[in-house]
């Protein structure tokens, strides 16, 4: 069989269909003897291998996507390794598509979402692998949160923070401002009763330990603990926080005046709980120089 000459037109077609670099496309076409479809199959196979290698890299950047239906909203976090890729239109298009697929199918389990149809005869997982091949970074669908309610306000701060809040009464503007407040102040609960018992107990232990270090009498220590817990609850409960639109007022007072009741909220921030690798550039240079001197 004679070898087919790879033309610029063939390379362009493969680039358009895969998004890969010119030299990668040229090499793939040479290996497939000019057959574009075979080249694509081979690249997908190598892409899966490449994706497996990339999976070990820490994906601590990314985007929060909000997909809203009539009575529910989905928050989806999709991670990549750098903020440069987080802003890439291919990455954001993938993340937005996955969020809408999750909403349409009412699926909140990440593993189950991966198996859903994505389009172009691909599953979500296959589309993710293809994107890893194209972009060259580890990309992961990390988590999904869903909130149901008749009135849901949503707010996204850049790509990094997403909030949805369910409420009764008031206006759409009030709901939007409430979502903005939650994005900015990151409450852990609506009110005191909603704060998790283990979280409150842990905070009390910390406050008590610090209070007892003062060496003051027990009755004073008890007052210090009481004051410390009150301050903590003012910081972490939505209704006790100072309102983002008017810090002279508490959120609870503003909502009461407007006849608004908060039923629930969800807030996601990119990379929460992920330990990002810190690069020591000076150490890297020193190690490189040491190797060069051997």
UniProtKB/Swiss-Prot annotation:
SUPFAM superfamilies: Elongation factor Ts (EF-Ts), dimerisation domain, UBA-like. InterPro entries: EF-Ts_dimer_sf, Transl_elong_EFTs/EF1B, Transl_elong_EFTs/EF1B_dimer, Transl_elong_Ts_CS, UBA-like_sf. Residues 82-85 are annotated as: Involved in Mg(2+) ion dislocation from EF-Tu. The keyword Endoplasmic reticulum does not apply. Keywords: Cytoplasm, Elongation factor, Protein biosynthesis. Associates with the EF-Tu.GDP complex and induces the exchange of GDP to GTP. It remains bound to the aminoacyl-tRNA.EF-Tu.GTP complex up to the GTP hydrolysis stage on the ribosome. This is Elongation factor Ts. It comes from Psychrobacter arcticus (strain DSM 17307 / VKM B-2377 / 273-4). The gene is tsf.
């Amino acid at each position: 069989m004679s070898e087919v000459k790879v033309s610029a037109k063939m390379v362009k077609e493969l680039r358009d269909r895969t998004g890969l670099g010119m030299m990668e496309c040229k090499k793939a076409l040479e290996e497939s003897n000019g057959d574009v479809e075979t080249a694509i199959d081979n690249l997908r196979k190598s892409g899966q291998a490449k994706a497996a290698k990339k999976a070990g890299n820490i994906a601590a950047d990314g985007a929060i996507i909000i997909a809203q239906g009539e009575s529910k909203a989905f928050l989806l976090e999709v991670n990549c390794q750098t903020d440069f890729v987080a802003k890439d239109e291919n990455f954001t298009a993938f993340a937005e598509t996955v969020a809408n697929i999750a909403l349409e199918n009412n699926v909140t389990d990440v593993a189950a979402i991966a198996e859903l149809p994505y389009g172009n005869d691909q599953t979500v997982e296959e589309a993710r692998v293809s994107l890893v091949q194209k972009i060259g970074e580890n990309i992961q669908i990390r988590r999904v949160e869903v909130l149901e309610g008749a009135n849901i306000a949503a707010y996204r701060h850049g790509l990094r923070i997403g909030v949805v809040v369910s409420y009764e009464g008031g206006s759409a503007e009030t709901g939007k401002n409430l979502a903005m407040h939650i994005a900015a102040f990151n409450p852990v609960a609506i009110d005191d009763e909603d704060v998790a018992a283990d979280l409150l107990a842990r905070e009390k232990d910390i406050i008590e330990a610090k209070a007892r270090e003062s060496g003051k009498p027990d009755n004073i220590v008890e007052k210090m603990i009481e004051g410390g817990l009150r301050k903590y609850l003012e910081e972490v409960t939505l209704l006790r926080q100072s309102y983002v639109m008017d810090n002279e007022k508490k959120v609870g007072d503003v909502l009461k005046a407007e006849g608004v009741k908060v039923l629930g909220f969800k807030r996601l921030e990119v990379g929460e709980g992920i330990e990002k690798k810190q690069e020591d550039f000076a150490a890297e240079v020193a190690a490189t120089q040491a190797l060069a001197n051997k």
